[in-house]
Amino acid sequence: MLTNKLSASRRVYTAVMRALLLLAAVLTAALVVFMIVYVLYKGLPYVTWHLISTKPSYITGAIGILPDICNTVQILLASLLIVLPLGVGAAVYLTEYAQSKKLVAAIEYAAETLSGIPSIIYGLVGMLFFCEFLGMQTSLLAGALTLVIMNLPTVLRTTQESLRTVPQSYREGAFGLGAGKWRVVRTVVLPGCIDGIVTGCILSAGRILGESAALLFTAGFAHTLNKFVIGLASPGATLTVALYAYAKEEGEFDVAFAIAAILMILTLLINLAAGIVGKQIQKRSQQ
């Protein structure tokens, strides 16, 4: 009798917990879908070719975000080209080569600490160090380097966790065939954890696209169309900074929602592209 009561109470408890977990999952998905649909509903009607292909003019009052799109792409590419080799290289060293456990623990603790620092503090430090101390002034390069420091812990930790999922037997089998350490890392370990590297890239790209506080101090507000690569030495506003400026300073909420919709579309395209590239790399490594 007692056993039946315990079994019944456990079934009730399991059913209640399952219902609560399902409710939490549904609410989370609903909130995400609502936010995406709402932003696209409010913003897409104002996304026009004229908006994305022209420069703003304070003389004529014309509104355009072409410089902001170009500046965003430049900062995104510059940041990823620096942070990915640094983060992946550091993760490989700490996981595959480092002998001192204290060193590994210290670096991991530092990375965890850095990932919790507010972005506005990164912006202040970037302004003082890159803009003032190194003499870069307010520029896209200073903003990109600040974002590198912000995203380095993310790439480092995601790559580390992915490297640790590669079975040790894979390494031992490669060593048994006479492969050296670097060859094992390059041909066995890295292809086996490409999903984690792609995840780190996606997370970093999303944070770079959505960052504004750090760039306000380092890259500036200027809606100027800078030349590719050479223009990294010049100031420029990104899409998120432009969104803030149009919504807060100028009261152009329609333009702000249009920029938000463009940012969502860019994030989706980056996620799709990163997933495709990751699958192609995996296929080539398995051939």
Locate each region found by the language model.
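Interhelical loop and adjacent transmembrane-helix boundary motif
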Residues: 56-63, 215-264
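Transmembrane-helix boundary motif in ABC transporter permease subunits
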Residues: 79-111, 124, 274-283
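Transmembrane alpha-helices
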Residues: 80, 158-159, 181-219
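C-terminal transmembrane helix and the adjacent membrane-cytosol boundary/short C-terminal tail
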Residues: 94, 160, 164, 202, ...
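Amphipathic cytosolic juxtamembrane alpha-helices at the membrane-cytosol interface
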Residues: 14, 99-103, 171-199
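Periplasmic/extracellular loop-to-transmembrane helix junction in inner-membrane transport proteins
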Residues: 2-20, 37-79, 100, 245-254
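Transmembrane alpha-helical segments of polytopic membrane transport and secretion proteins
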Residues: 1-25, 274-287
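Generic hydrophobic transmembrane alpha-helix motif, especially the helices
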Residues: 112-150
